[in-house]
Amino acid sequence: QKLDQVAIPDFAMGAMENTGLVTYRETLLLLDPIAAAPDERVNVATTIAHELAHMWFGDLVTMRWWNGIWLNEAFATFMEVAACEAYRPDWERWTSFGVERSGAFDVDSLDSTRTVEFEVRSPADADGMFDVLTYQKGGALLRMLEQYLGEDRFREGVSHYLRSHAYANTETNDLWDAIEATSGEPVRRIMDTWIWQPGYPLVHASLIDGSLRLSQQRFRFGSAYTESE
């Protein structure tokens, strides 16, 4: 029932979400209340919100294996923005998140991109999961799902997920099960394509003889449009 937040001199990492004791690099927790620049305030608030989110996503409920690390980090990324948006709407964190997300779009447009979740067989594979696809793309997918379901139904599903798996391990299917159970929506059918397929779609619209025709393909840098599915 107690949570301490500690600034540590020369802390190698940015911050670490130990249960009940979050440790930070000094510059990510301590601010001059008078002289701190607006960007510093946003950065500190974002970091604190991210680490506090891990008390639920990562500590209370932990992924079964490293392939599911997005369940921890994408939720923490989503919650850091949502919390700051509620705390200081004037910061417009969802707007700035759109800029942050662009880094994931860039990576996801390469032929060498990966899926959000893939089989982890080695420490190197696990280390490779900590990138913009896990954090920014994963957070953007959760935001997309929230906007599809509506804030209340999304929150109800996530709460059911946390309550059902408290102090236990989960995988992505457990999240979809929980949200489907409370919302009645085909969440797995919608979201699995985003989690298990690389890239993102480019939708092409054309007007042919008075009829609107829609098609899509995976977007790639330097690729000319060719009609697919």
Regions found by a protein language model. Name each.
Residues 1-217, 221-227:
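Hydrophobic alpha-helical and helix-loop surface patches within well-folded domains
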